[in-house]
Curated annotation (Swiss-Prot):
One Gene Ontology MF term: protein-containing complex binding
Membrane spanning residue stretches: 9-29
Pfam families: TPR_21
UniProt similarity note: Belongs to the YfgM family.
All ranges on the Cytoplasmic side of the membrane: 1-8
Biological source species: Buchnera aphidicola subsp. Acyrthosiphon pisum (strain APS)
Protein name per UniProt: Ancillary SecYEG translocon subunit
Coiled coil region boundaries: none
Length: 193
C-alpha cells in the first residue's frame, strides 16, 4: 500500500508541475502576443498618420482613445505633429491634453507639456504656456524650459527677462546646435538695442 501511495504522490506532483508549466507558458505567450499585436497596430497607425489622406486621422484618433498605453501617447504626439504641420493647432492641443490625462511616465508627461507649451506660444497664449512650463519640475528639462521662457518673454516684449532666461539655458545646455541658436537670439537682441 505504501508503494502505491508513493506512486500516486509522484504522479500528482508531476501532474501539478506539468499543468503549472503549461499555464505559465500560456500566460507568458499570451502577454507577448498581446504586446506584439499592440506594437503592430501602432506601426500601422503611424504609417496612416504619415499618409496625406485626412480620412485616416479619424481611425488614428480612435486608436489613441482605445489605447491609454505608451503606444497611445506616442501616437498622440505624432498626430499632434501632423496637425501642427497642417496649422490645425486646436486639434493638436486637444490630442496632447487628452494624452496628458492618462500618461503615467514622467518624461512622457514632460514631453507632452513642452509640446503643449510650444503650440500655446504659436497661438500667442503666452501665460498658458508659461504656466504649463512651471509645472515641469524635473531639472533635466531646465535648459529647454528656460529657452522657451526666453521666447515667451520676447513675445510679451520683456527683453530683459528673455536675455536672463536664454543665458540660463545657455549655461545649462550641452548641445552645440542649441547653444548656437541661443547665441543667435542673444546677438539679434543686442543688435536691436
Amino acid at each position: 500500500m505504501l508503494n502505491i501511495s508513493k506512486k500516486n504522490i509522484i504522479f500528482f506532483i508531476l501532474f501539478f508541475l506539468i499543468i503549472s508549466l503549461i499555464l505559465f507558458n500560456w500566460k507568458y505567450f499570451s502577454l507577448v502576443n498581446k504586446e506584439n499585436l499592440e506594437s503592430l497596430k501602432y506601426e500601422k497607425i503611424i504609417k496612416k498618420i504619415n499618409k496625406k489622406k485626412s480620412k485616416n486621422l479619424y481611425e488614428v484618433e480612435n486608436f489613441i482613445v482605445q489605447n491609454t498605453s505608451i503606444y497611445g501617447t506616442l501616437t498622440a504626439l505624432s498626430l499632434a505633429k501632423k496637425y501642427v504641420e497642417c496649422n490645425n493647432l486646436d486639434k493638436a492641443l486637444l490630442q496632447l491634453n487628452n494624452s496628458l490625462k492618462y500618461t503615467k511616465e514622467e518624461n512622457l508627461k514632460n514631453l507632452l507639456k513642452i509640446n503643449i507649451a510650444k503650440i500655446q506660444i504659436q497661438k500667442n497664449e503666452n501665460n498658458k504656456a508659461m504656466n504649463i512650463l512651471e509645472t515641469i519640475q524635473n531639472h533635466n528639462w531646465k535648459n529647454i524650459i528656460e529657452h522657451m521662457k526666453g521666447d515667451i518673454f520676447i513675445n510679451i516684449n520683456n527683453k530683459k527677462e528673455a536675455i536672463k532666461s536664454w543665458k540660463k539655458s545657455l549655461f545649462i545646455e550641452d548641445s552645440n546646435a542649441s547653444k548656437e541658436i541661443i547665441n543667435m537670439k542673444l546677438n539679434e537682441l543686442k543688435e536691436q538695442n
